[in-house]
């Protein structure tokens, strides 16, 4: 399968600036770039689909460059509804360093920073050398600008698209970049760069956008209860990422396999058939989790996440290490435990049971487990010998309600 055909089959092409791009991707070796502004010191899983296409294009012989917007990050891409909050120079510099390291470590990309070529351009030079080529009416026709005109848009935000156009022209001059790839929300910024090069009598530049990856409810992939899933495993553990991916809706999982993995067309179609025959096995979800986590963090991290999941499901808490327990129970209710606290007091004081009578009922019914083992003695006391790693005790009520007790 040729490059463009592969991208189309995977649903990775939304808009292209010229029909010529298909032939160029299939038969030439292009240098292209993908950019991100440093709003945080780590990429999140939503970036993953965008940057994975760069790796995919590289496998077809094209050369990727990642641009981290040390300059544009100081301005902020206009949001559809309101002005974006500016971040400090110190934050931007810290975030640039984090993203640059991550791009090298995960994707192996060459990284450039647009602050390097914008920092010495004066306002006069910017307006004379670049601003004179872009008509205001052209900028007003951008969708994002149209949406903001009624509520108001600052000149700072208005000029953002011209700064990104400057990036494209500069990357072409310095690195031979002829293609920008981005999410569909960046189409207006891509076309500004193409127009700027044309007006400056430069070479023809090309753009391609990808559809946003959405879940079954139309929410952007990677958004979970308002929290981002980070590619930095110190911010989002492999187990947390595993849980997110393994719970992918059946309606979306094949689409995700196409867009977020390097599995072949034949392999994905085989998985799809098995998923239809036995949806309860969730073979597609496990395949997705394995491919994504292994790519980001390695096979060992995937196996670790899988082990935590299996042990938690089976109740084999004692087979888990302290670190695995902390990963697996990061979001469950936790509380302090004192030496020789009675089991009944532990349940009542921490709202696991509403009263001592209810606590006794839970215990006698076998509904309470400590570190995976049922406790049926009402007089049981919990001492530090129960503490896994000398720190934590895992309490379960019923089949799914977990709590984490921490010895102090």
Describe these PLM feature segments.
Residues 21-78, 180-187:
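N-terminal catalytic cores of NTP/NDP-binding nucleotidyl/phosphoryl-transfer enzymes
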Residues 76-80, 121-127, 219-225:
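Short acidic, glycine/serine/threonine-rich loops at helix termini
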Residues 200-408:
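Conserved nucleotide- and phosphate/pyrophosphate-binding catalytic cores
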Residues 73-84, 171-175, 225:
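Acidic/polar active-site rim loop that often engages polyanionic ligands
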Residues 59, 63-76, 83-107:
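Well-ordered mid-protein domain cores that form the structural environment of catalytic cofactors
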Residues 1-33:
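Positively charged, low-complexity intrinsically disordered leader regions
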């Amino acid at each position: 399968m040729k490059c463009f055909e592969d991208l189309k089959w995977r649903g990775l092409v939304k808009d292209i600036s010229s029909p010529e791009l298909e032939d160029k991707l299939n038969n030439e070796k292009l240098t292209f770039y993908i950019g991100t502004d440093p709003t945080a010191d780590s990429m999140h899983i939503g970036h993953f689909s965008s940057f994975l296409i760069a790796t995919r294009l590289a496998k077809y012989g094209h050369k990727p460059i990642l641009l981290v917007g040390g300059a544009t990050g100081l301005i902020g891409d206009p949001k559809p509804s309101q002005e974006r909050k500016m971040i400090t120079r110190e934050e931007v510099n810290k975030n640039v360093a984090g993203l640059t390291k991550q791009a090298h470590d995960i994707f192996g990309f060459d990284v450039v920073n647009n602050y390097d070529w914008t920092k010495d351009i004066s306002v006069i030079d910017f307006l004379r050398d670049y601003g004179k080529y872009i008509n205001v009416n052209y900028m007003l026709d951008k969708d994002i600008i149209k949406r903001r005109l009624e509520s108001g848009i600052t000149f700072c935000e208005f000029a953002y698209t011209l700064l990104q156009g400057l990036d494209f022209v500069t990357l072409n001059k310095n690195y031979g970049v002829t293609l920008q790839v981005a999410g569909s929300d960046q189409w207006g910024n891509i076309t500004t760069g193409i127009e700027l090069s044309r007006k400056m009598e430069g070479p023809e530049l090309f753009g391609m956008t990808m559809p946003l990856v959405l879940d079954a409810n139309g929410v952007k992939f990677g958004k979970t209860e308002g929290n981002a899933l980070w590619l930095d495993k110190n911010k989002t553990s492999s187990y947390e990422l595993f849980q997110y991916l393994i719970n992918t809706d059946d309606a979306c999982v094949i689409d995700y396999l196409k867009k977020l993995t390097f599995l072949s067309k034949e392999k994905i179609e085989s998985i799809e058939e098995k998923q239809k025959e036995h949806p309860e096995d969730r073979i597609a979800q496990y395949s997705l989790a394995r491919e994504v986590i292994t790519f980001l963090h390695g096979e060992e991290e995937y196996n670790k996440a899988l082990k935590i999941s299996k042990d938690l499901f089976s109740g084999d808490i004692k087979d888990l290490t302290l670190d695995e327990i902390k990963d697996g129970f990061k979001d469950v209710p936790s509380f302090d435990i004192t030496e020789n606290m009675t089991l009944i007091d532990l349940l009542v004081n921490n709202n696991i049971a509403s009263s001592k009578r209810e606590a006794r009922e839970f215990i006698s019914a076998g509904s309470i487990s400590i570190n995976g083992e049922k406790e049926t003695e009402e007089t049981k006391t919990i001492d530090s010998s129960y503490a896994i790693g000398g720190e934590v005790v895992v309490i379960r009520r019923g089949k799914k309600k977990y709590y984490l007790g921490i010895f102090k």
